[in-house]
A protein has these predicted regions:
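Primarily a LysM-type cell-wall glycan-binding module
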Residues: 41-63
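Extracellular LysM carbohydrate-binding repeats and other cell-envelope/extracellular binding modules
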Residues: 61-101
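Flexible, surface-exposed loop/linker segments and immediately adjacent secondary-structure boundaries
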Residues: 86-89, 94-286, 565
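Conserved aromatic anchor
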Residues: 288-297, 380-390, 477-486
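Short beta-strand segments within Ig-like beta-sandwich modules, predominantly Fibronectin type-III
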Residues: 315-321, 408-414, 503-509
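Surface-exposed, short loops/turns at beta-strand junctions within beta-sandwich domains
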Residues: 328-334, 421-428, 515-523
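Extracellular fibronectin type III
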Residues: 345-358, 436-461, 533-547
Length: 570
């Protein structure tokens, strides 16, 4: 079984407005596909005769066997070897030409890519020159970019096995023949328009042959299943299996199809590019989640990172079922992110691309205390995990989450701890820490003396507790105080201002307490807030109060009885 895809008008489609004007009739496309099924041996090269050319001279210059000039004469129906008319056209079968072998250059290697077959040798590196027959395996996480000729490149994704087939040309006339055997995996080819119509660029899978003359075309193969996606240009597709009628169709720009064996699926329009406006252009974390909005019809996403906008230097390649991905495992640098959505047939849509700068080092430390949402009472420290090899830190505290209203900006801070300022008024604060660069650690992407600030944490400085003057009533002593609401408070009552032996020492809820009237004398009372984790605030200033001695009330005599006692005196 063999299927060949032939570029049908890619050069026209590269001109402005050509996409709307190019309407290849189905018959013409299928004819092209059928013609393409004939091997290179049946194809011809048309030579424009130059002044002074002869059949013998042309044969000596171009033919693999110069003695075939009489056959060339008969093919072109020429009567004798006389000087040919300048500007006339001479037909020459491609398999008569004198081909010379070319090489392909390894432009980029990511991860480990190894050669396959006899004499495979060490892992491949950039700059290697490859010849026809060289095979390779990108492994689970490797990627490879080959430069073939005149800007034509092919990028092979992870888990790809392929080999170079034909790599040849005819010197002096610009006829080239390139074939890549894609056994499994995926290839993304960018083919510059071939100058000579007799030139061929083919990628063959176990079931499909794709031939282009200048287009952006993606292929993937896994067993009998293959996927074909035309980004620019137009192609004709014919699937042929011995003993069966050919299956034929056409693919236009922004179309794709899925083939199973020789059976070609119905062409469908590729999904549009995703919206990458929400992808950050600057990343300051070694692991950063990125995402795109869901896309109608999408059932998967293909993410790639490269060091160049053309994606010839592929660094990462991964697929996810959801429109989110984690960028990680990259050194600081400038990168390009590319994502495309895949439909139910796993046909991948148009690219969406976003450049970003990764500036994540030196990494900020992890904040330990106060944690986000914590309450602070009394003297407290800000504490963070100590980063390895960190010479010092920069600490910022602000009243706002954007750190525009700073109350503290201190550097260098040596060690993983800094005391809070006791003068900060009650309220909410935000704090964060950055690691300073070591001396001489200014790399090519270092910006300033420090790395990025870490994620900030929010804490609240609670107001101090204040004890109100106690009120002594006939039913006891009434205590009230002000302080942070929603917390318990500890109350101490003592007869000495040192509170060495308090008569009352308990934690109570709320901001009010009623006690029985103690024995007469002087007393001192104070309070402190108690947080749920057991931490306590500062003691309030003690309040002193006096419980007076009890005074005997005068006796009361009945007035009538008093008058009776006074009668004898009258």
């Amino acid at each position: 079984m063999a299927t060949r895809v032939v570029n049908a008008g890619a050069q026209r489609l590269n001109k402005p407005g050509a996409a709307s004007r190019c309407r290849w009739p189905a018959a013409a496309l299928l004819l092209l596909a059928q013609l393409a099924l004939n091997a290179h041996a049946a194809e011809e090269f048309t030579l424009v005769v130059a002044p002074g050319d002869t059949l013998i001279g042309i044969s000596q210059r171009l033919l693999d066997d110069p003695a075939r000039w009489p056959e060339l004469q008969r093919l072109n129906r020429l009567k004798r070897d006389i000087r040919l008319k300048a500007g006339s056209r001479l037909r020459i079968p491609l398999d008569w030409l004198r081909w010379t072998e070319r090489t392909a250059e390894v432009l980029h290697v990511q991860g480990v890519v190894v050669g396959t077959g006899p004499g495979a040798g060490a892992p491949w590196v950039a700059g290697m020159q490859l010849k026809a027959g060289d095979g390779f395996d990108t492994g689970a996480s490797g990627a490879l970019t080959l430069r073939l000729y005149e800007g034509t490149t092919v990028v092979f994704s992870p888990q790809t096995q392929a080999a170079l087939g034909r790599l040849r040309e005819v010197a002096g006339i610009g006829v080239q023949a390139t074939t890549i055997e894609l056994k499994k995996g995926a290839a993304d080819s960018t083919v510059v328009p071939l100058k000579n119509p007799a030139s061929r660029f083919e990628i063959r899978t176990p079931r499909v042959v794709t031939a282009v003359r200048g287009t952006r075309f993606r292929m993937a193969a896994e067993g009998d299943i293959s996927r074909h996606e035309v980004v620019t240009g137009a192609v004709a597709v014919a699937g042929v299996e011995p003993g069966r009628a050919a299956s034929e169709t056409s693919l236009k720009e922004v179309q794709g199809l899925r083939a199973e064996g020789a059976s070609l699926g119905t062409p469908v329009r590729l999904l549009p590019p995703s919206d990458v406006s929400g992808v950050p252009v600057r990343i300051e974390r070694i692991a950063q989640s990125v995402g795109v909005p869901p896309l109608a019809g999408a059932q998967g996403w293909h993410w790639q990172v490269a060091s160049d906008a053309a994606f010839s230097r592929l660094l990462q390649d991964e697929r996810t079922p959801e429109p989110t991905w984690v960028v990680t495992g990259l050194p600081d640098g400038d990168y390009h992110l590319r994502v495309r959505a895949a439909d139910a047939q796993q046909l991948e849509g148009l690219d969406a691309q976003q450049a970003f700068a990764l500036r994540a080092r030196p990494e900020p430390p992890v904040l330990l205390a106060p944690g986000s949402g914590a309450s602070v009472v009394g003297p407290s420290d800000m504490v963070w995990a100590e980063a390895m090899d960190a010479p010092a830190y920069q600490v910022q505290v602000a009243r706002d989450a954007r750190f525009a209203d700073l109350v503290l900006d201190r550097a260098p801070v040596v060690g993983p701890r800094l005391a809070m300022d006791a003068t900060w008024p009650p309220g909410q604060y935000h704090w964060r820490v950055a690691t300073l660069r070591a001396a001489g650690a200014q790399g090519p992407f270092a910006e300033g003396p420090r790395g990025p600030f870490g994620d900030g944490a929010t804490f609240t400085v609670l107001p101090p507790s204040v004890m109100a003057p106690p009120q002594i009533g006939t039913d006891g002593v009434h205590l009230t105080w002000t302080g942070p609401t929603g917390f318990s408070h500890k109350i101490q009552l003592a007869t000495d201002p040192s509170f060495a032996s308090p008569q009352f020492d308990q934690v109570v809820p709320g901001v009010r307490l009623d006690l029985p009237t103690p024995a007469p004398g002087a007393y001192f009372v104070r309070t402190q807030v108690v947080l749920p984790d057991g931490r306590v605030g500062a003691w309030s200033s003690p309040q002193k109060f006096e419980v007076p001695q009890k005074v005997e009330a005068p006796r009361k005599y009945p007035w009538p009885l008093l008058l009776l006692l006074l009668l004898p005196l009258l």
